[in-house]
Amino acid sequence: MKADVVIVGSGPAGIFTALELIKNGSKKKIIMVEKGSSIHKRNCPKSKTKKCVGCEPCNITAGFSGAGAFSDGKLSLSYEVGGDLPSLIGEDFAQSLIDYTDKIYLEFGADTHVEGINQGEKVKEIRKRAIQSGLKLVDCP
């Protein structure tokens, strides 16, 4: 089997790499290599054993979409949530990447509902309790 591009791993980074190559008009033959099982064969024994038994590869994180395959698809839409990316590339650019990613998810059918938008009083109360506990509540968006 011949390929121009080999993407190792079909987690979010691998999936988005392939998508960006295609969206940017690449005519190259792309192969994705994944060590994990298909989604239908990814069963974690922890639900029965109540502890990790060290499957190799891990049935939660390895496989198409990684652990995201089992998530409900919610994204944090603010650069203030997560790691150090804004300090490396700037807040505006980090936010533009988040917005770009959200747009892709929406193009593929993600739910457009944004939680908490119409619950101003409830959010104020949660923010007050967070501040009292020494926490910062981040609006997303």
Describe every region a protein language model picked out.
Residues 23-29:
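Conserved S-adenosyl-L-methionine
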Residues 1-13, 31-33:
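Beta1/beta-strand and adjacent pyrophosphate-binding region of the FAD-binding site
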Residues 7-9, 17, 73:
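Conserved structural-core and active-site-/substrate-pathway-adjacent residues in large, well-folded domains
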Residues 18, 22:
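Gly/Ala-rich phosphate-binding loop of Rossmann-like dinucleotide-binding domains
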Residues 35-42, 46-141:
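Conserved N-terminal/central alpha/beta ligand/cofactor-binding core
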Residues 12, 28, 43:
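Functionally constrained cores in energy, signaling, and assembly domains
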